[in-house]
């Protein structure tokens, strides 16, 4: 994996004449489409543990949150080529725009720790539209390929792609050996291809309003239709992912036959354009602590 799944940031700073220790942990939940940062400030053992001391610690948490949010987001995949850190390097202006997300973050009620030894607080932002709007650069969806020959298909209510098991990574074959097998990694802007590398859904083919509403696809580890009926409806096209694609394996590859069943129908192409896609991934990819 390109990034370590769990990162605990620990640092000490001086404030109001006493040392306070700050712990920061971030978590992304693709089921709820939220990114959360939990900060915890511990009062130094040499400082009196009064309500005023805890209040100062809480104030420090709020001051440190923008930096913790920025650092926590850096490893998050945007697409199969970039994590947010890469995007910031290519466009430094993104750094200030990401930092501004802290202003509108949801904040939990501060939670005093036992014996007033500190305080913790959780902050969260939504992936859609708060974060994705920073990376969507088109206003009108690009036209998708249309299959004009007759294809056995029908109108579906959504598209469900099963990708919970390790998949062959496209392009990883070496000599006569089998390809590397990887878990599909959720991303803000995933793409879909068939196994011949024909584009089925690229970033600029989806309606920006759909991305703002609920993202390109809904990630879940639930196979029960009740868990994703609102997104894919009651009669979805169910597809098995064939391969994963990308430097970061975020993109799904499906069979040419399944791709044809989608691209041969105006109705089914609109399912892609409107983000009526569910991707079933392994449970450890859904709720990730960094």
What are these regions (language model features)?
Residues 18-290:
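Domain-level marker for long, solvent-exposed, non-transmembrane regions
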Residues 4-13:
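Sec-dependent N-terminal signal peptides
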């Amino acid at each position: 994996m390109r990034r370590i799944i769990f990162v605990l940031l620990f640092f000490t700073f001086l404030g109001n004449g006493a040392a306070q220790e700050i712990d920061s942990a971030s978590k992304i939940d693709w089921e709820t489409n939220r990114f959360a940062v939990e900060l915890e400030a511990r009062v130094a053992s040499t400082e009196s543990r009064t309500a005023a001391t805890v209040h100062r610690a809480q104030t420090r948490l709020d001051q440190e949150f923008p930096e913790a949010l920025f650092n926590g987001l850096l490893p998050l995949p945007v697409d199969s080529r970039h994590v947010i850190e890469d995007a910031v390097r290519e466009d430094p202006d993104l750094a200030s725009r990401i930092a501004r997300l802290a202003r509108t973050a949801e904040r939990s009620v501060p939670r005093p720790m036992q014996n007033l030894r500190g305080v913790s607080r959780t902050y969260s932002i939504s992936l859609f539209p708060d974060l994705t709007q920073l990376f969507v650069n088109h206003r009108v969806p690009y036209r998708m390929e249309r299959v004009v020959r007759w294809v056995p298909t029908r109108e579906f209510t959504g598209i469900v792609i099963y990708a919970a098991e390790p998949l062959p990574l496209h392009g990883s074959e070496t000599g006569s050996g089998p390809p590397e097998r990887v878990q599909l990694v959720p991303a803000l802007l995933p793409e879909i291809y068939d196994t011949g590398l024909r584009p089925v859904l690229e970033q600029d083919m989806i309606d920006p309003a759909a991305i703002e509403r609920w993202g390109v696809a809904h990630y879940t580890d639930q196979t029960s239709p009740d868990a994703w009926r609102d997104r894919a409806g009651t009669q979805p096209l169910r597809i098995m992912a064939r391969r994963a694609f990308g430097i970061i394996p975020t993109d799904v590859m499906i069979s040419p036959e399944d791709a044809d069943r989608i691209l041969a129908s105006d109705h089914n192409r609109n399912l892609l354009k409107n983000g009526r896609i569910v991707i079933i991934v392994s449970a450890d990819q859904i709720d990730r602590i960094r």
